[in-house]
């Protein structure tokens, strides 16, 4: 798993934490074919990420999933036996919190992609709602993706896997990852007993609570699904104004500090 190398002065983070970029769900089961209509599969530079369709022309994912030669697939369940309504797109434009595409702060691992042409809703394709309010601590939320389901070797599934995890206090993640900046623009989510988690290949995918996208898979412990090591998710609610401004055409909009 790729080690975090964002803040040079946070050496302990560099040594201990792993980003889930080019990063299946650990401890999950095959998703119901109808429950992930907004889930997007992305390939770039030989890597894999996930994303979320939020309207017919826009996909929300992680900034660290940016790369060249990106292909975006919608309506996918089985990679080997594609659905008849699978649609493929490429980015028309990409937007980041910072114009230099950096996400040095842990609250800026977010990217908004405008597709080259609109997507048509179908049996296996539909957008997911943006959050109406932030999730409360203790909420049960859904993770999903085509990432590896093994913590010891990269074993990727043919179909996406899903699992339920819980929202935790930010302090839980601060205790798990010493040196984590005191910011409230991320969500701390997972199973403290371990065994269920996002992992390599799930980056950029959604954390779904009550039918809304509340988080974007960002990073976590060096081994996925470890005890007392929840995952770190970009908090979508805190970026709503930026998202809506970009979609409305205000490309100079900036993310919250």
From Swiss-Prot:
Keywords: Disulfide bond, Glycoprotein, Hemostasis impairing toxin, Hydrolase, Plasminogen activation, Protease, Secreted, Serine protease, Signal, Toxin, Zymogen. It is an enzyme of class 3 (hydrolase). Its EC number is 3.4.21.-. It comes from the Eukaryota. Gene3D superfamilies: Trypsin-like serine proteases (2.40.10.10). Disulfide bonds join 31-162, 49-65, 97-255, 141-209, 173-188, 199-224. One of its GO terms (molecular function) is serine-type endopeptidase activity. Residues 25-248 form the Peptidase S1 domain. The active site is at 64 (charge relay system), 109 (charge relay system), 203 (charge relay system). One of its GO terms (biological process) is proteolysis. Coiled coil: none annotated. This is Snake venom serine protease Haly-2. It comes from Gloydius brevicauda.
């Amino acid at each position: 798993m790729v080690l975090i190398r964002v803040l040079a002065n946070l050496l302990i983070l560099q040594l201990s934490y792993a980003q889930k970029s080019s990063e299946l769900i650990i401890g999950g089961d095959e998703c119901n074919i109808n429950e992930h209509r907004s889930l997007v599969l992305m390939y770039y530079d030989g890597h894999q990420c996930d994303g979320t369709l939020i309207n017919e022309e826009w996909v929300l994912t992680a900034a660290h999933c940016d790369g060249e030669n990106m292909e975006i697939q919608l309506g996918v369940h089985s990679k080997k036996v594609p659905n008849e309504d699978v649609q493929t797109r490429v980015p028309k434009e990409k937007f980041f919190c910072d114009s230099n595409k950096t996400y040095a702060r842990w609250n800026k691992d977010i990217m908004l992609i405008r597709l080259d042409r609109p997507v048509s809703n179908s049996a296996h394709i539909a957008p997911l709602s943006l959050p109406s309010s932030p999730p409360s601590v203790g909420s049960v939320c859904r993770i999903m993706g085509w990432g590896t389901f093994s913590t010891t070797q990269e074993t990727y599934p043919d179909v996406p896997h899903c699992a339920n995890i819980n929202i935790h206090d930010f302090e839980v993640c601060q205790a798990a990852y010493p040196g984590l900046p005191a910011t409230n623009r991320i969500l701390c989510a997972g199973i403290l007993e371990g065994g269920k988690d996002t992992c390599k290949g799930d980056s950029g995918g959604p954390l779904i609570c009550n039918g809304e996208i509340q988080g974007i898979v960002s990073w976590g412990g060096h081994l996925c699904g470890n005890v007392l090591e929840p995952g770190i998710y970009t908090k979508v609610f805190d970026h709503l104004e930026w998202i809506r401004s970009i979609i409305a055409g205000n490309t100079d909009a900036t993310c919250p500090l």
